Amino acid sequence: MAPPMTLEQWLLWKKMSQAHQALENVTTLTEEQKQQVIIDIQHEDVVPTRMDKLKYLAYSCCATSTRVLCWIVLVCVLLLVVFISCFVTMSRIQWNKDIAVFGPVIDWNVSQQAVIQQIRAKRLARSIRVEHATETYVEVNMTSIPQGVLYVPHPEPIILKERILGLSQVMMINSENIANTANLTQETKVLLADMINEEMNDLANQMIDFEIPLGDPRDQKQYQHQKCFQEFAHCYLVKYKTTKGWPSSTVIADQCPLPGNHPTVQYAHQNIWDYYVPFEQIRPEGWNSKSYYEDARIGGFYIPKWLRNNSYTHVLFCSDQIYGKWYNIDLTAQERENLLVRKLINLAKGNSSQLKDRAMPAEWDKQGKADLFRQINTLDVCNRPEMVFLLNSSYYEFSLWEGDCGFTRQNVTQANSLCKDFYNNSKWQKLHPYSCRFWRYKQEKEETKCSNGEKKKCLYYPQWDTPEALYDFGFLAYLNSFPSPICIKNQTIREPEYKISSLYLECMNASDRHGIDSALLALKTFLNFTGQSVNEMPLARAFVGLTDPKFPPTYPNITRESSGCNNNKRKRRSVNNYERLRSMGYALTGAVQTLSQISDINDERLQHGVYLLRDHVVTLMEAALHDVSIMEGMLAIQHVHTHLNHLKTMLLMRKIDWTFIRSDWIQQQLQKTDDEMKLIRRTARSLVYYVTQTSSSPTATSWEIGIYYEIVIPKHIYLNNWQVINVGHLLESAGHLTHVKVKHPYEIINKECSDTQYLHLEECIREDYVICDIVQIVQPCGNATELSDCPVTALKVKTPYIQVSPLKNGSYLVLSSTKDCSIPAYVPSVVTVNETVKCFGVEFHKPLYAETKTSYEPQVPHLKLRLPHLTGIIASLQSLEIEVTSTQENIKDQIERAKAQLLRLDIHEGDFPDWLKQVASATRDVWPAAASFIQGVGNFLSNTAQGIFGSAVSLLFYAKPILIGIGVILLIALLFKIISWLPGKPKKN
């Protein structure tokens, strides 16, 4: 190898190289001139600068021998290894210090309130285009959520299931029997059969046939009560003490509005309008109202002669509109039925059908206490006129006609104390225009005026002017809307000593003595005493007068065949059930409802038996239909179709139509409350296990439906429930945004009275209600030792994090990593505003009512929680929800848990630049200067180094342990090689 150049030689070489490069681009000089320039440069004296000396030193190092170069490389590598090792060691020491630093404290119990100002554009009324900005102030109420958990109402009751019982039922449908009952013609019989076949075929096409285990039927005979109640539940017979009808052909009832179409207020149809005497302007010559309406006035009400018959001795009525307040329409039909039957039994005189005097109001009998029937009020005459005309013992006239009670235009101000000096001051200008005046003014006489010899079409002038324009004058006066000259007169109609009997009680008593068929036939005939059955009339008008009826009626002798029960197992797909009912003497129009009793082999409280399922037979006619014999042909078919379609729909939905099965015996045997029975009815399921046609002809058809029921028996019902919404808390830790939650052991909070229970549900199904196999009562989370120790989990989330969820009460659930509208960051809050405002890019609207304070029940124990400092890094490294601590750990336990978690993650390996950034993030809260330096190194390695060497640098860091081992081996080998190069003795050259 040639020796290196001296400093002067290197400077001359450098100068000559620069001169050659400069002359190559010059074209104005000749070759001789260029040679002369080079010669001149060679003879110039050059003084070396410091930079030249440094550059020469670098040249001399590279131009020396290979041994010297290797020594230089070795020293550089060793220095680099020492530097990196020291840096990594310092970073790891800082990392361990970061772990031991106390973390943040989370305390959710904070409430805030803020008033923010927003600019809104307001448009003036005079200008459509110009909008002016106005300042509005919006109140934002924020309520913290304890433990990051929101409780919202859980409307569905939760049922802890005790067991499930099974029941089977066979339903028979026979069109011929329905047709005979409704007196259908042959054409309508064909239509009825086609309709039944269509519905049943539709059901059969969606159901498969299969067998279920069935036992012997054990029947409950409730036929007498069912048929008697169905026909005569609200039917009564009242007997007068003396025969006396309504004393006049008219009734003054100004409290009732008048008929007609009026533009301002439309009143519902009043039944007394049927007796209204209308005004007609055109009448024949000499016409007067007395000739046609007797004492009734034009614009008043005329009572026909059949309603004021003086020979009436009894009143027969079938209506539930005269019962007292005990008959609450909000109750179910079953509850009203049971209540009525109990009252009738308690009020009956011995075993007779006559009721005690206290059942009636005092107006009917002096000993009356209105235990069953109420007192007739003033407005009853408007909608129930027949009840008033036939049952009232006295009547108070309500009149606003001039001349009644001696009031005229001259003394009208004396009729009411509020009308005194009415026209002598300005008082009349401030009152209602109807005040202190009559509804109908009396004229001198009633007359007709004819012109030009016309005798058939004359102008009629009644004695009282017509009131149609003031159709509700009297009704408003009755409501005391204004002072008026009301004339109230009491007139006695008949003596108040009535005797009353119940047709339902008579039916029950007669069915025991003469049989149910005989009792039904005789009492139905009695209801048809006047030619029209009373129980067919509308309930408001089902009141008729009778003259000396025979009661109790004569009961005919009806023979019935009877046979013993067939205990053999039911034969499938046969008419055996139909024949069994026939042999027992029950007609399909009123077949006995034979109800199965549940027996469970695991419950000795119930009736003993070995079969879980019991079979019973029921027919469509008596189970769901009303008496179609009172309907016309097409109406009866439509009625049957409605019930049949409803039955099919319920079966397809696997629901139970409880009109086909009575549940009172279920309640008695299971000993359940009314609320529990409501749940049993709602949660019960049905399954059709066969549908078959037993007979068919062009005009008749019959079907059988086998139905299996599953009844859920509740063990406990949780009604007042709250559902848990685990919102959590946001945490900015070590440069990472983390979503922290307390993992609560319950999903539902139940609060009954003052007791709060925390429920954990397992194996639940949601069918209208939530039905669960397992409901565990657990302890809530809290700092007290006796409470549950719940894990706290953390999950890394991206920033910015904004969660806005509207609640059903009009408020908003907000969890955000930023602050807006004075809503705090990181803390879950329930926000309520009083005006529309836009926050976090979402419009917040006010609730339906002003809410200044929001309270959520039930309350949970207070929870104050300290988390590890590196919670965000731990969650970030695993990128999934992990457990970072528990609710009862102290800070020492939390630090140990964090160390163990970080060591287990082995964060020192892997992507070295990313690890340095993690160290910088963890150090930023503890040592900002060191964090900046470490962050800079990490950015250099990830950005600059990546730009120079590409992704290979990052990939090599993942193989760092292997590369370090290989590098150490190579360095040792190189060291021995260099030592071998060292000379043992000086060489001559």
Curated annotation (Swiss-Prot):
Residue runs in coiled coils: none
Glycosylated residue positions: 109, 141, 183, 309, 351, 392, 411, 424, 490, 509, 528, 557, 783, 809, 834
Annotated transmembrane regions: 66-88, 962-982
Name listed for the protein in its UniProt record: Envelope glycoprotein gp130
Site residues, Cleavage: R126, S127, R572, R573
Pfam family, one: Foamy_virus_ENV
Residues in compartment: Lumenal: 89-961
GO cellular component, one term: viral envelope
Keywords for the protein's UniProt record, in alphabetical order: Cleavage on pair of basic residues, Glycoprotein, Host endoplasmic reticulum, Host membrane, Isopeptide bond, Membrane, Signal-anchor, Transmembrane, Transmembrane helix, Ubl conjugation, Viral envelope protein, Virion
Function: The surface protein (SU) attaches the virus to the host cell by binding to the cell receptor. This interaction triggers the refolding of transmembrane protein (TM) and is thought to activate its fusogenic potential by unmasking its fusion peptide. The transmembrane protein (TM) acts as a class I viral fusion protein. Under the current model, the protein has at least 3 conformational states: pre-fusion native state, pre-hairpin intermediate state, and post-fusion hairpin state. During viral and target cell membrane fusion, the coiled coil regions (heptad repeats) assume a trimer-of-hairpins structure, positioning the fusion peptide in close proximity to the C-terminal region of the ectodomain. The formation of this structure appears to drive apposition and subsequent fusion of viral and target cell membranes.
Keyword Oxidoreductase: no
Record region (Involved in virion budding): 1-15
Residues in compartment: Cytoplasmic: 1-65, 983-989
Annotated S-S bridges: none
UniProt modification remark: Envelope glycoproteins are synthesized as an inactive precursor that is processed by host furin or a furin-like protease to yield a functional hetero-oligomeric complex.
Motif Endoplasmic reticulum retention signal: where in chain: 985-987
Domain of life: Viruses
UniProt subunit comment: The mature envelope protein consists of a trimer of SU-TM heterodimers. The N-terminus of leader peptide specifically interacts with Gag protein. This specific interaction between Gag protein and Env glycoprotein may allow particle egress.
Other facts noted in the record for this chain: Foamy viruses are distinct from other retroviruses in many respects. Their protease is active as an uncleaved Pro-Pol protein. Mature particles do not include the usual processed retroviral structural protein (MA, CA and NC), but instead contain two large Gag proteins. Their functional nucleic acid appears to be either RNA or dsDNA (up to 20% of extracellular particles), because they probably proceed either to an early (before integration) or late reverse transcription (after assembly). Foamy viruses have the ability to retrotranspose intracellularly with high efficiency.
Cross-link annotation Glycyl lysine isopeptide (Lys-Gly) (interchain with G-Cter in ubiquitin), location: K14, K15, K34, K53
Region Fusion peptide, residue ranges: 577-599
InterPro entries reported in the protein's UniProt record: Foamy_env (IPR005070)
Comment on protein domains: The ER retention signal plays an important role in establishing the intracellular site of budding.
